């Protein structure tokens, strides 16, 4: 009897262990990455061209550039320079001459080899002031002035390496199979990509889709990744959407069409800056999902953002307005398709009126002031400040390194001119379907699709 009871316990334990093992195997099988499937992305952004060097720059252009093309180096999440098409580099002449050694065995999507001649041609076109020399597997770049952190600049999307001809060819993990400017792009995964084939078979991108249409197709299961407007992120989270967001990495700024022509005009701009309640904008319009900004670069990048006050000072704004005397009405322009820009512009008008300033919105391209949004890059302080100046049509700063003190001084000097008034740093937010696994974005909103795979469908 005792023996039968012991056997019964042994059998029960064996069954329990077998059940646990089977469950573990099933779970492992269910979560193990698998190849196949097409990732469907919908966005409100549009592109007329996939050429990385075309203006205007945008987060969408940068993300597509990373899928189709490569740069000589990349910047990781910690701001460190990592090899990409180049596996080593060195400098001489105190940072005025740089030499890069190309990796071997890299091919374009048509199977042709990457050569130093092709690399040099791409860099010359993107940077006419550089002297670029190719020899063997070496690419040498001679600059007009020394730049100690020059490789960071080569990580920018506009310096992606491509071969131009009847079509643009790249060395990235995907190749373009269909392209309808401003509407649709279809990419296919490359089996011969140097870092190994991605799990996805392809990516389908639908452009120019309003937020409401994106939400509908997402809820119907027809889209995997959609935009979420910064001011809608809290609501989307409350509705149970799965969200992925970046650090505050898009600058919303007031940009004046010209420099202040007199001290009176500078005082009026100072009064406008003092009147705007940025913290209230962030709290009410963004529900604290962004950051009030008085600096061009975000604090997470520089560490010095707190040195610029974003608080409103209506008393000081009124005083400056009185000192300035008679003033004309400013015309404020913005992108009419940008719902957030519209409500921010309305808030600016109210704040300005409280300070005695006259501002009216306009859809004209010749506005006195424009409310614009500029995506930031994950490079370094010096490079990013130079890129911001370029995006705003302002002569780039001449800094040889990303020393924080020198970057702060350059930014502070520029902000004192009141050519621009920073308002907010925004996050890039995406809605992700349950079938998308391992989706992640960088601090600047860049997609990382190398490990992305799809569950539940092909």
Task: Pin down the residues of each PLM region.
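Acidic-aromatic pocket-rim loops
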Residues: 2, 363-402
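Surface-exposed binding/hinge segments that line
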Residues: 97, 101, 124-164, 173-180
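N-terminal lobe/hinge region of extracytoplasmic solute-binding protein
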Residues: 42-93, 169
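Alpha-helical secondary-structure segments
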Residues: 116-117, 121, 138-140, 201-202, ...
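Structural transition elements
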Residues: 287-324, 336-342
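Long beta-strand-rich cores associated with HINT superfamily self-processing modules
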Residues: 432-458
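Ligand-site clamp/hinge motif
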Residues: 192-236
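Aromatic- and charge-enriched surface segment that lines or borders ligand/interaction sites
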Residues: 87-130, 140, 262-264
């Amino acid at each position: 009897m005792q023996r039968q009871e012991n056997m019964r316990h042994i059998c029960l334990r064996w069954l329990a262990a077998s059940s646990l093992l089977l469950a573990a195997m099933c779970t492992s099988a269910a979560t193990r990455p698998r190849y196949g499937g097409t990732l469907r992305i919908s966005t409100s952004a549009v592109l007329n061209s996939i050429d990385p060097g075309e203006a205007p720059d945008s987060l969408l252009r940068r993300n597509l550039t990373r899928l189709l093309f490569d740069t000589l180096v990349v910047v990781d999440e910690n701001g460190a320079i990592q090899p990409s098409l180049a596996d080593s580099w060195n400098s001489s002449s105190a940072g005025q001459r740089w030499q890069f050694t190309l990796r071997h065995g890299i091919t374009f999507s048509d199977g042709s080899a990457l050569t130093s001649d092709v690399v040099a041609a791409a860099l010359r076109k993107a940077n006419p002031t550089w002297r670029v020399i190719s020899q063997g597997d070496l690419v040498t770049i001679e600059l007009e002035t020394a730049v100690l952190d020059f490789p960071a600049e080569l990580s920018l999307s506009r310096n992606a390496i491509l071969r131009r001809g009847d079509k643009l060819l790249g060395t990235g993990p995907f190749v373009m199979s269909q392209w309808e400017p401003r509407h649709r792009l279809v990419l296919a995964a490359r089996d011969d990509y140097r870092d190994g084939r991605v799990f996805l078979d392809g990516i389908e991108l639908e452009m120019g889709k309003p937020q409401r249409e994106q939400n509908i197709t997402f809820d119907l299961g027809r889209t995997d990744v959609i935009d979420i407007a910064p001011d809608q992120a809290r609501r989307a989270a409350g509705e149970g959407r799965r969200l992925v967001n970046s650090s505050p990495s898009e600058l919303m700024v007031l940009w004046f069409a010209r420099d202040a022509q007199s001290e009176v005009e500078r005082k009026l701009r100072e009064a406008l800056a003092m009147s705007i309640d940025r913290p209230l904008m962030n709290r009410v319009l963004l529900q604290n999902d962004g950051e009030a900004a008085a600096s061009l670069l975000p604090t997470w990048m520089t560490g010095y953002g707190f040195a610029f006050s974003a608080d409103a000072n209506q008393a000081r704004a009124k005083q400056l307005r009185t000192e300035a005397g008679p003033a004309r009405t400013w015309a404020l322009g913005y992108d009419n398709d940008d719902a957030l820009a519209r409500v921010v512009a309305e808030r600016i008008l109210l704040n300005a009126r409280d300070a005695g300033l006259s501002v009216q919105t306009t859809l004209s391209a010749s506005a006195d002031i424009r409310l614009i949004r500029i995506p930031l890059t994950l490079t370094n302080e010096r490079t990013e400040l130079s890129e911001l100046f370029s995006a705003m049509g302002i002569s780039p700063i001449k800094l040889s390194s990303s020393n924080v003190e020198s970057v702060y001084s350059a930014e502070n000097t520029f902000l004192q001119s009141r050519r621009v008034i920073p308002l907010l740093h925004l996050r890039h937010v995406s809605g992700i379907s349950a079938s998308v696994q391992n989706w992640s974005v960088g601090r600047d909103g860049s997609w990382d699709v190398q490990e992305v795979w799809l569950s539940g469908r092909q």
